[in-house]
Amino acid sequence: MKFDPAEIREAAEKDFDGTWKRGVDYLERPSLERIYPRRSYPHGRPHPVFETIQRLREAYLRMGFTEMMNPVIVDAQEVHRQFGSEALAVLDRCFYLAGLPRPDIGISESRLSEISSIVGKELTAEEIEALREILHSYKKGAVEGDDLVPEISKAINASDSQVSMMLESVFPEFRELRPEPTSRTLRSHMTSGWFISLSNLWYRMPLPVRLFSVDRCFRREQSEDAARLMSYHSASCVVMDEDMSVDEGKAISEGLLSQFGFENFRFRPDEKRSKYYIPGTQIEVYAYHPGLVGSETKYGSGWVEIATFGVYSPTALAQYDIPYPVLNLGLGVERLAMILYGSKDLRALSYPQLQPDWSLKPIEIARMIHVDKSPMTVTGKEIARSVVETCVKYGNTPSPCEFDAWEGELFGRRIKVSVVEPEENTKLCGPAYLNEIVVYRNEILGIPRTPKWEAAFEEGVQTGIRFIDAFAELAAHEIEMATIEGRGSETRVRIVRTAGEINVRIDPALERYITSYKKRIDIRGPVFTTVRSELMQGDKHGEKT
């Protein structure tokens, strides 16, 4: 809390040690919901693929490359120009784009009758002509599909819902439309875009030209699996210069990948031998990463195939009137991310939300365990602390017994709070009242601090919630509610069988996580105690209860 520096200085001059010790009085005494680990500084987490993309962008920029955006939609004719006799094999892996045709729609007398019944009026000659004009413009492409309903609605003075119903029931041509393929494809390689871009740049940029692009590509795989996705990201670069050799690719490989911790590079001829590369220049890049050594992935040796480069063939470049040699290097972003993040499955890495398996860290589990009801006021928090202190001090006292825990003013009423156990031959509190909630081996346990559970406290994550702490906050909350209403209260806890019985709330997502892995939520035990509050005699708002 805020303090007066002048007052502190004056007190320190008179009694420095005492003033220093009283410094604790200025510290916040938070409720259970505001203590660590529930009190935290959460931060968003980037997706591993996009984090890797950003790192690649920064790495290329540091090497002096300029970022470009290449065309995503590429006509099949361009693929034939680039790949020559291999084009059909490449196009077999491409997604072709299709579109709905624009039907030629007539308006007969019977259709006008149906329209009138839907919109609830006879269309005027001007409205009929406007409707015909809009449908004709739609056929010609002058009116877009998403503008069709509002345009008709405005022309015939009808609601959007009426027009939508009209198009659905009166004009079956719209329902019967089937997509028609085009010759346009989604690029399956970044190379498809590089040829188009370079054909427009070679004559207006000084050599050497160094460009890169990290963007999405699409490949029509038969199915997706741990190593293949139909949509992936390619990190590709090109260097265009009068003098070019494969050594340029080796230098780029080392310069780029060394920024990700790779070292000791090996270069091997690629057996694929694509026709858009000069023979003998298509090279696979292998790199050693010390962080992979001994990992449970297939890269446990530390060596991994990570990239491919080659020099574009003059026969392909000539199709675009490009007169200079061009070296191209590319790597799959998802593959690099798998290596950097230790993932074994591209699907789980890219789309974790779609996978049946999921994981939570122990600290994340602890932060999903909450106290359900807490006092609202500073005085209420003080009452909860006093109840806890009383139970800790007198918890083993034989019963029947009663101890005053707190007395003072709350909401303008003077009250007294007591901890009570009226039954005979027990104690003020049951054996489990000091049990603590700990996350241990993905299980949530309410356990005592005994040698038996030493490993759980040492290796697990402590939530900072004891049974008596959670119960005391519930009691203080109910005391606040009762005092507002001008009455006393009694809060009891007996044998705890579930978390809710001790005022602990488990996030539903956490419950599903624990049960899906057949782990336990074991919060139970005999607590057996009662907290009472009563309005004091002479309270200005009412009588003693």
Curated annotation (Swiss-Prot):
GO biological process: one example: translation
Keywords noted in UniProt: Aminoacyl-tRNA synthetase, ATP-binding, Ligase, Nucleotide-binding, Protein biosynthesis
Top-rank taxon, per record: Archaea
Binding site for substrate: H189, M190, T191, S234, A235, S236, Y276, Y277, N328
Disulfide bonds listed in the record: none
UniProt-listed Enzyme Commission number(s): 6.1.1.27
Catalytic activity: tRNA(Cys) + O-phospho-L-serine + ATP = O-phospho-L-seryl-tRNA(Cys) + AMP + diphosphate
GO molecular function, a single term: ATP binding
Known partners and oligomeric status: Homotetramer. Interacts with SepCysS.
Similarity section: Belongs to the class-II aminoacyl-tRNA synthetase family. O-phosphoseryl-tRNA(Cys) synthetase subfamily.
Role: Catalyzes the attachment of O-phosphoserine (Sep) to tRNA(Cys).
Xref: NCBIfam families: sepS
Protein name: O-phosphoserine--tRNA(Cys) ligase
The organism of origin for this protein: Methanothrix thermoacetophila (strain DSM 6194 / JCM 14653 / NBRC 101360 / PT) (Methanosaeta thermophila)
